Amino acid sequence: PSRGLGDVYKRQPGKRNSRDTKVTDMLYACYAKAEAGEEFRVPLMKIKERYDSIINGLGLKVTLDEEFKTISKNFKEKAGADYAASRGEYLNGILMADYLGYEFIDSATVIFFDEEGNLDADKTDKVLAKKLSECEKAVIPGFYGIGADGRVKTFSRGGSDITGSIVAKACHASLYENWTDVSGCLVADPRIIDNPQPIHVITYRELREL
């Protein structure tokens, strides 16, 4: 069936190859240096180089210079590990929005957590629905929001998937699809077994057991 593309939530870049390091891990390592009072400019610039290569490869006109200045400043001010981990999603969302010509919505302005660290579903749904009603198309980073203390907070594992479902609910989407870099479910871990066969039909119960 045909699909209309309205709201897009975006994950950050992963590994470019099996020997590569994920951006999240690079950000964690960089923040650890900042938290310990060590020099972190060089590893931070390595992260920027990865994003610059994406910008150049796609022929985008956007620049992330100011964003990285802000990240550096916030790292020095100990913005927190959640803030560090979320920056990959944030930066990639900016690039995707520029590439698609969509509006960029920072998740920290529309996804809220309460004082206990749980999703404030009612506030999030209300604010997000209003924001989405004001724009035709938007890119929203997954994985994070803002805590009651005003600091960036991340969801637990699978947070990008959760963000997608939150956005789908807020805009009353008739269909929400979660795409990954693997085509379906496989009978074995492809990192261990070469060319494992796909599972064509599987129940939710069976999937949960996997």
Which residue stretches match the model-derived regions?
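Nucleotide/pyrophosphate-binding catalytic subdomain
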Residues: 7-210
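Single conserved hydrophobic/aromatic residue that forms the stacking wall/gate
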Residues: 1-6
